Amino acid sequence: MLATLLSARIRGDIAVAAARALFEAGLRDARSMADATWQQRVDALGRGGYRRYDERTSTILGKSAALVLDRYDGDLRRLREEPDPKKALLDIPGIGPTGADIFLRDVQGIWPEFAPYADPKVLDGARRLGLPASPEELGGFVAGRDMPRLADGLVHAALDKHLAEEVLAAAEGR
């Protein structure tokens, strides 16, 4: 759900607040999302501040839930059985390349067969900090369960030049 929300052209903090509002409304899994009415999803998204795309996103969340129920019996852990999990994620309505990358980046900490996963944004951050730009080399720096944290930090470095400069200065002892 969060990957779908983060895939839209909306600020990350609003997407996270909307995910929290959906969760608080009891829309916590594919079954509850599919069982909710379109309006219930719109209302929950609105409470989370997700207003610009709320109607479209409500429809997408309903379709996504239906696909997850049909293909995975409501259990995304079955995605682990897919020969190409990123391609399978892209089949889910509302999940684009960015959403698939976010999902795989975060889930690798609990699904070790996906680690080390480093998408282009992670690799951009690694290059900006002078680190190796290969998933395997980056994965060698941390335990598998910590790879999502490293990846998230590198994404922040990719998106925020000043943060990257601060990290580099701290590493040099300035």
Per-range role (PLM):
Residues 8-10, 26-27, 69, 130, ...:
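Short alpha-helix boundary/capping elements
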Residues 25-93:
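Alpha-helical ds-nucleic-acid-binding substructure associated with the helix-hairpin-helix region
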Residues 10, 51-56, 141-149:
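Structural motif
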Residues 3-14, 51:
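A short secondary-structure junction motif
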Residues 11-16, 31-34, 54-58, 97, ...:
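Alpha-helix N-cap/helix-initiation sites
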Residues 16-26:
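A positional/architectural concept
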Residues 1-5, 45, 61, 103, ...:
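Short alpha-helical scaffolding segments that buttress acidic/His motifs in well-ordered protein cores
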Residues 97-174:
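C-terminal accessory module of base-excision DNA glycosylases/AP lyases that mediates lesion recognition
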